[in-house]
Amino acid sequence: MNLLTPEAWKALLSRYSHIVLVANSEAVDFERLRSELPETALYVFFNNVYKVLDEPFAGHAVLVARSGVMGANIVHRREVGDVLHFFAGDDFLGVINIRVSPEENFSEESRFNGAKARHLDLTQMLGDLYPQGKIATSGFAMALWLADLQLPGKILLAGFSAKRSEKWKVFDVHDWTFEQIFLRLFARMGSISMLGGVDASPYSALGKRFPNVPPIEIAMTAAEVLSERLHNANGQIDRLMSVTKSIRAIENFFRRFKPKTRKERYLEKTKK
């Protein structure tokens, strides 16, 4: 495994004026990014970059390949070639194969079709931080790690909305609420910047309108309102679950006949 020390990582990344983490989201505005940022910016892409790229990327770039139990996801899904064709030349820094939980395994450098591959183990950093029973997203893990490196360049997060779109979904294995709270606090502390309108708090105007009200009172009132709205939403969700009970029963019946995935077969084999 090609594991680097924190000092080596810092030396590698300190040459860039900006480190831009690009989420696989429709919220990414590439035209704005490329027009506002200098050529010395490094763009960090994640896994299936075809979600945000339509053509080969011209500029400094690095690809973060997330690991699963069978190794890097793009490796065991045979997507390495499909992903790497978006990058070429000396401006491509290569692949960073990361793992964020003990169940995830690295892939060997030779599995990335000749691209320079480095490995980054973030399990210890996230072990006592992330909520139990959930797994951190690659973007969150990389943002936290980069902030801890204390690089001279600015760290920018593009498209980190945690919102489901008509085209791409968000996965329930991640704690999106925790990540958004953490990242926005990070942004307001100045450790990172978030592009896409999430830097400004929609409740900041309340503090200006009620200057004599302590911030904790404003926060508690907002939490009270949100709690009531969540309670009402849960009631509607319960009703929806009841209405769709028969549909889910039919779906579960036919799901039993669905062929097992390569991952499921691999896990069964490892348990024997």
Spell out what each predicted region is.
Residues 1-272:
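Metal-ion/cofactor- or nucleotide/acyl-coenzyme-handling active-site neighborhoods
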